Amino acid sequence: MLQLHPSDIKDVVLNGGVIAYPTEAVYGLGCDPDNDTAIQKLLAVKQRPWQKGLILVASEFSQLLAYVDESQLTDEQLELAFSKWPGPFTFVMPIKPHVSRYLCGEFDSIAVRVSAHEGVRALCQALGKPLVSTSANLAGEDPALSGDEILNVFEGKIDALVLGQLGEQRQPSTIIDARSGKILRNGQ
């Protein structure tokens, strides 16, 4: 497994690799959201059913416009998300028709977040697009909090480990349905 700085990870991700990287609270697993083979590999590594869907994390909202159908949201609904970003808030938003079922699962929506974590932002900026994001753990297990934990669980199963520090957050992000404003998961 390669151990790389965020600026060196672009080729791994764009060539279908699955990576582990530090986020606001825990290590995440990620891949290219436009590569179904990479998404399927990530789901298999994590032992996560595709039906649950995944999160996209971005450095800015404009990176999410290829996936989110903002025409189905009012200015007020968008403003709620913009008022919380960048930060530990994930919003469930309507999807565009072409979005992979592996990303949205059985839903007509997708979970998206604009991160405040400098390492995550650097990854997304280097890629020029969002990154699939899910906690780095096997389904039902605790997420990894260190590079050593990543190596213990995922050695030989993922393509690279991004070096960096976790953020200060100790809880997962709050998840809000952008259409209804309903809190689906209380986080931080």
UniProtKB/Swiss-Prot annotation:
Catalytic activity of the protein: L-threonine + hydrogencarbonate + ATP = L-threonylcarbamoyladenylate + diphosphate + H2O
Gene symbol of the encoding locus: tsaC
Enzyme class: transferase
Keyword ATP-binding annotated: yes
UniProt function note: Required for the formation of a threonylcarbamoyl group on adenosine at position 37 (t(6)A37) in tRNAs that read codons beginning with adenine. Catalyzes the conversion of L-threonine, HCO(3)(-)/CO(2) and ATP to give threonylcarbamoyl-AMP (TC-AMP) as the acyladenylate intermediate, with the release of diphosphate.
Species for this entry: Shewanella oneidensis (strain ATCC 700550 / JCM 31522 / CIP 106686 / LMG 19005 / NCIMB 14063 / MR-1)
Keyword annotations from UniProtKB, A to Z: ATP-binding, Cytoplasm, Nucleotide-binding, Nucleotidyltransferase, Transferase, tRNA processing
GO cellular component: cytoplasm
Keyword Transcription regulation applies: no
Protein known as: Threonylcarbamoyl-AMP synthase
